[in-house]
Amino acid sequence: MAIPSGGGSEILKGVGFDQSAAATVDCITATTHQICSILTVTLTCTGGANNVSLLTGTKYILYNQAIDSGGTFIWNDKVVFQAGDIFKIRLHTATQVISYVSYIVQDWS
């Protein structure tokens, strides 16, 4: 995608998930002419201890982060991805984790 030079929109959004299976969940998909910027990811382990990973597409940006039962982990590093990429959260163990992601979507369509 080329660097946009025209007008567009910039919207602050948030999405939350309640996961309890050892699986990878697609959280945010950047569509054509979009740039997404992850601001913060908050992960709270309400079940037993768990390990969590964050991905964009197939690339891990955080791998196997341990979170104790009743604990919270906050990811504050900014991550930017473009059209065709998907931001994902992966639980390595089948215990309950509540996730919240705040992000900005820039749409140049």
Model-based region annotation:
Residues 39-44, 87-89:
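Buried hydrophobic-core signal for structured, non-transmembrane domains
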Residues 64, 78-79:
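Short, surface-exposed secondary-structure edge patches
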Residues 79-96:
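Noncatalytic modules at the cell exterior or secretory-pathway interfaces
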Residues 47-65:
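Short, surface-exposed beta-strand/strand-loop-strand elements in extracellular ectodomains
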Residues 72-78:
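Exposed aromatic-hydrophobic patches
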Residues 65-72:
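Short proline/glycine- and polar residue-rich coil/turn motifs
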Residues 1-34, 40, 91-109:
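C-terminal interaction-tip segments
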